[in-house]
């Protein structure tokens, strides 16, 4: 049994995590943090997420026995919440290098799982992308296309960047050396480039495609999230890991490799 507190409890992902926690017999939803002054302060978390009354109220701060903080907020809020000193699962995307450094510093004192995508399927596919990139070699051009709902703020997605890094590492390169974000103008494709493209529209939960273009064939790896529930369940899996881990910064790869 673990205790979790959800930061960003009134948001899309926060509500989904609250609901998943309330439906999981091995998880206690200890609390939910919402923005100071929000109309959701004091709201019942179960009613907020559509699961029925839970007897746990949303608040501006974590409760005394918060357990693991599950964080799906903004980069600014995520950094601010590090001051709680709680074990954490961070699914917030769009962190700057400076903000990530602050997360790394906080992880010296508490276990933190930092994962732009909590989906088990996506994280298993990263290894597939790396192996394909290595095995197919430089004769295959790599393009990554991701699509999300119109409200997503950061582009490209953190998951697209993870896939780009996996593809680049399969060829012994760093993504920063070979990435091209979108295309325009008049010029041929550069040798070894990895193109990354972002689409935004409608209510798309999340789609990622990695395409290896050869001269005589194409190989495509696709992941489609059909609902946010997959991310919520992955976050709770990461929370179980964080509850038992030593201080340090971890990824979903660490979570999956430790799970039976």
UniProtKB/Swiss-Prot annotation:
Pathway: Amino-acid biosynthesis; L-lysine biosynthesis via DAP pathway; (S)-tetrahydrodipicolinate from L-aspartate: step 4/4. It is found in: Cytoplasm. SUPFAM superfamilies: Glyceraldehyde-3-phosphate dehydrogenase-like, C-terminal domain, NAD(P)-binding Rossmann-fold domains. Pfam families: DapB_C, DapB_N. Its EC number is 1.17.1.8. (S)-2,3,4,5-tetrahydrodipicolinate binds at residues 149, 158-159. It is an enzyme of class 1 (oxidoreductase). PROSITE patterns: DAPB. The keyword Iron does not apply. NAD(+) binds at residues 8-13, 35, 91-93, 115-118. Signal peptide: none annotated. GO terms for cellular component: cytoplasm. It catalyses: (S)-2,3,4,5-tetrahydrodipicolinate + NAD(+) + H2O = (2S,4S)-4-hydroxy-2,3,4,5-tetrahydrodipicolinate + NADH + H(+); (S)-2,3,4,5-tetrahydrodipicolinate + NADP(+) + H2O = (2S,4S)-4-hydroxy-2,3,4,5-tetrahydrodipicolinate + NADPH + H(+). GO terms for molecular function: 4-hydroxy-tetrahydrodipicolinate reductase; NAD binding; NADP binding; oxidoreductase activity, acting on CH or CH2 groups, NAD or NADP as acceptor. The active site is at residues 148, 152. Keywords: Amino-acid biosynthesis, Cytoplasm, Diaminopimelate biosynthesis, Lysine biosynthesis, NAD, NADP, Oxidoreductase. It comes from the Bacteria. One of its GO terms (biological process) is lysine biosynthetic process via diaminopimelate. Belongs to the DapB family. NCBIfam families: dapB (TIGR00036). PANTHER family: 4-HYDROXY-TETRAHYDRODIPICOLINATE REDUCTASE 1, CHLOROPLASTIC-RELATED, DIHYDRODIPICOLINATE REDUCTASE. Catalyzes the conversion of 4-hydroxy-tetrahydrodipicolinate (HTPA) to tetrahydrodipicolinate. This is 4-hydroxy-tetrahydrodipicolinate reductase.
């Amino acid at each position: 049994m673990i205790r979790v507190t959800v930061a960003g409890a009134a948001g899309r992902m926060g509500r989904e995590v609250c609901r998943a926690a309330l439906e999981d017999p091995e998880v206690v939803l200890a609390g939910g943090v919402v923005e100071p002054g929000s109309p959701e302060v004091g709201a019942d978390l179960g009613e907020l997420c559509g699961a029925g009354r839970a007897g746990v109220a949303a608040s501006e701060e974590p409760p005394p026995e918060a357990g693991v903080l599950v964080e799906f907020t903004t980069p600014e809020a995520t950094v601010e919440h590090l001051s709680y000193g709680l074990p954490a699962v961070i699914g917030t995307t769009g962190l700057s290098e400076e903000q990530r450094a602050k997360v790394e510093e906080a992880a010296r004192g508490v276990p933190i799982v930092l994962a732009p995508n909590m989906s088990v399927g996506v994280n298993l596919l990263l290894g597939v992308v790396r192996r394909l990139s290595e095995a197919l070699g430089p004769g295959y051009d790599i393009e990554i296309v991701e699509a999300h709902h119109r409200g997503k703020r950061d582009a490209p997605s953190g998951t697209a960047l993870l896939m780009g890094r996996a593809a680049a590492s399969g060829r012994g390169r760093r993504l920063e050396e070979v990435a091209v974000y979108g295309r325009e103008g008049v010029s041929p494709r550069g040798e070894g480039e990895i193109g990354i493209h972002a689409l935004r529209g409608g209510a798309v939960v999340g789609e990622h495609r990695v395409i290896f273009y050869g001269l005589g064939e194409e190989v495509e790896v696709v992941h489609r999230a059909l609902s946010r529930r997959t991310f919520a369940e992955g976050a709770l899996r990461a929370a179980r890991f964080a509850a038992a881990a030593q201080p340090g910064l971890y990824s979903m790869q660490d979570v999956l490799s430790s799970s039976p």
